[in-house]
């Protein structure tokens, strides 16, 4: 069950995506987004950027990963670099490539890079997705890793600038699946989730990331159009129906580090980073 290292660096064919206001509004509603422009479908939320990259990113993972390991896949990290906001009417094109495979003591990490452009070729955003294959062993590491975004201990030792408490609804995963296009049964089928070693269905990691983005934008009192980077590491799953709490530190000019914990105080998002135009 070796990973296909020959696929590293090979781009997928571009995938087209039309940005519709209804899809923006549906995504905002599915993530309990409090920002009015998002709810009205006038401006895409930050994590909405993953939707145009969903198909090409999955294709890039499948190019390197053995099919028999796919049910052991979990989302490890996500990192967005924003060059311009996504708004209704945009015709977008996204391509993705697997760029690295890394063996760890607990499994194998596959790093995928995606880039989304307008119909005219202008760069809209770049993304790095790290997927983790639990329990996979015996793989040679190759290629590159995604950019780092770890929270420095010196930053963690400072006072927080704020903390936001939010609630993940009992039906959150069902509501998120349709507008996101992510129907992975670990988020929808209790029996299936348990069969692959999870405690039950879990919230989509990107949905939890969207919650954290609302928290950071609100506490920073920032215009979401000025967001330049948003990154997290998915540390632990969040069951639906739980409260979560996001603590935020200032880490530089326009930059904030953040960490999200569940109601059991387990850290679910770590090494969070949000960078706004100063």
Task: List where the protein language model places each region.
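Hot-dog-fold acyl-thioester-processing enzymes
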Residues: 1-77, 138, 142, 146, ...
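Context-gated lysine
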Residues: 15-16, 165, 228, 236, ...
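Catalytic-pocket segment enriched in acidic/His residues
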Residues: 187, 191-253, 258-266
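HotDog/MaoC-like acyl-thioester-processing domains
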Residues: 1-6, 73-164, 238-241, 247-278
């Amino acid at each position: 069950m070796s990973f296909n290292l020959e696929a590293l660096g090979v781009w997928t064919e571009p995938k087209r995506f039309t940005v519709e206001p209804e899809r923006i509004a549906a995504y905002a509603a599915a993530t309990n987004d409090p920002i009015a422009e998002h709810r009205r479908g006038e401006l895409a939320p930050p994590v909405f950027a993953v939707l145009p990259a969903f198909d090409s990113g999955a294709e890039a993972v499948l190019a390197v990963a053995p099919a028999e390991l796919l049910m052991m896949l979990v989302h490890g990290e996500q990192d967005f670099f924003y060059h311009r906001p996504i708004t209704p009417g945009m015709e977008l094109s996204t391509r993705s490539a697997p760029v690295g495979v890394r063996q760890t003591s607990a499994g194998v990490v596959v790093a995928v890079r995606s880039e989304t452009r307008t119909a005219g070729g202008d760069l809209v955003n770049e993304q790095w997705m790290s997927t983790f294959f639990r329990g996979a062993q015996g793989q040679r590491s190759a290629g590159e890793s995604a950019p780092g975004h770890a929270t420095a201990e010196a930053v963690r030792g400072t006072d927080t600038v704020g903390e936001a408490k939010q609630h993940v609804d009992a039906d959150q995963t069902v509501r998120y699946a349709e507008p996101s296009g992510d129907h992975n049964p670990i988020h929808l089928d209790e029996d299936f989730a348990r069969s692959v070693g999870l405690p039950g269905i879990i919230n989509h990691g990107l949905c939890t990331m969207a919650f954290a983005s609302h928290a950071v934008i609100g506490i920073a009192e920032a215009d979401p159009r000025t967001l330049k980077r948003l990154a997290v590491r998915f540390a632990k799953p969040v069951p639906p129906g739980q409260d979560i709490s996001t603590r935020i530190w200032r880490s530089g000019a326009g930059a904030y580090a953040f960490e999200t914990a569940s109601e059991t105080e387990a850290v679910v998002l770590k090494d969070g980073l949000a960078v706004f135009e100063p």
